[in-house]
Swiss-Prot record:
It catalyses: thymidine + ATP = dTMP + ADP + H(+). This is Thymidine kinase. The keyword Iron-sulfur does not apply. It comes from Streptococcus agalactiae serotype V (strain ATCC BAA-611 / 2603 V/R). Gene3D superfamilies: 3.30.60.20, P-loop containing nucleotide triphosphate hydrolases. PANTHER family: THYMIDINE KINASE, THYMIDINE KINASE, CYTOSOLIC. Homotetramer. Zn(2+) binds at C143, C146, C180, H183. GO terms for cellular component: cytosol. The gene is tdk. Its EC number is 2.7.1.21.
Length: 189
């Protein structure tokens, strides 16, 4: 029986590399997968998942109004698994579509992304995945300052912490730092 998996972690926790690893494992056995990512993620290239260690792969971009269920249902070959990167940017509708892929098409879905933003609020996609997922797992990494478990994301601008602004600002290591709670409130900058 297929399940909806939500795997979350802070920045630099290896979420995308995990997607690429899972895809490779399925495909090594001749089992096709579908890799999708939010259309908002344009860090490297539109419609591409890319890890910080340099591995990359084409992906189907997901817009807020995309009918993911119909897209998967109408593929010429049923996938063995659907892998989603940057799931925090998904809309409520997108997440409910993913649940239908699992329940109605019996295709497992693994969604990877951030849980909370730089202000410590849940993203829309994360909120609905926490509500609907059958299995929820944390992908761990360490605080940049003290090596304790990182649970938050610190946004920086010109070397200074930022606690206000738009929820979504696409960026990488130059903008966001994985931190523990202590260093979120008192960063060593």
């Amino acid at each position: 029986m297929a399940q909806l998996y939500y795997k979350y972690g802070t920045m630099n926790s290896g979420k995308t590399i995990e997607i690429l690893k899972v895809a490779h494992n399925y495909e090594e056995q001749g089992k096709p997968v579908v890799i999708m990512t939010s259309a908002l993620d344009t860090r490297d290239e539109f419609g591409v998942v890319s890890s910080r260690i340099g591995m990359r792969r084409e992906a189907v971009p997901i817009s807020d109004d995309m009918d993911i269920f119909s897209y998967i249902q109408n593929l010429p070959q049923k996938p063995y698994c659907v892998l989603i990167d940057e799931c925090q940017f998904l809309s409520k509708k997108n997440v409910y579509d993913l649940a239908r892929v699992v329940d109605d098409l019996d295709v497992p879905v693994m969604a990877f992304g951030l849980k909370n933003d730089f202000q410590n609020n849940l993203f829309e996609g994360s909120k609905h995945l926490l509500l609907l997922a059958d299995k929820i797992d944390e992908i761990k990494t360490i605080c940049q300052y003290c090596s304790k478990k990182a649970t938050m994301v610190l946004r920086t601008e010109n070397g200074k912490p930022v606690y206000e602004g738009d929820q979504i600002q696409i960026g990488g290591n130059e903008t966001y730092i994985p931190v523990c709670r202590k260093h979120y409130f008192n960063p060593d900058i």
